[in-house]
Amino acid sequence: MERGPTLVLVVEDDPALRLVCRVNLELSGFAVAEAATLDEARSAVAAESPALVLLDLHLGGTAADELLDELRAAGTAVMLVSGTADVRAYEGRASAVLAKPFEPAELVETTRRLAAAS
């Protein structure tokens, strides 16, 4: 049986950045689901079981630590993104860390690497 494209859940409260991520990942062959809040992200994870979650560390001022821990416990690969300096402190807790602003090519390359490892 043939597997479809790897599903990536983009959890980002900035609609413009969410769109940039979606377009670049879809053009690179990934299937993409989106969430703008932690509640939407939890629902999407339960409904769609993504292979990888791209998680904004600070969603509308809310830290995503709890969701990160839930995803890691479930064995889901997590790429953290953040525009704040504290994102590097999470390197041991996430599968990958991407500091904003990032280049679309960096997003796609990191996503490919994590998808290949899962």
List PLM regions with ranges.
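Conserved acidic carboxylate
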Residues: 12
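Short amphipathic alpha-helix used as the core "switch/output" element in two-component signaling
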Residues: 43, 62-76
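Two-component/phosphorelay signaling modules centered on CheY-like receiver
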Residues: 15-33
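Acidic, metal-coordinating helix/loop segments flanking the phosphotransfer/catalytic sites
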Residues: 34-52
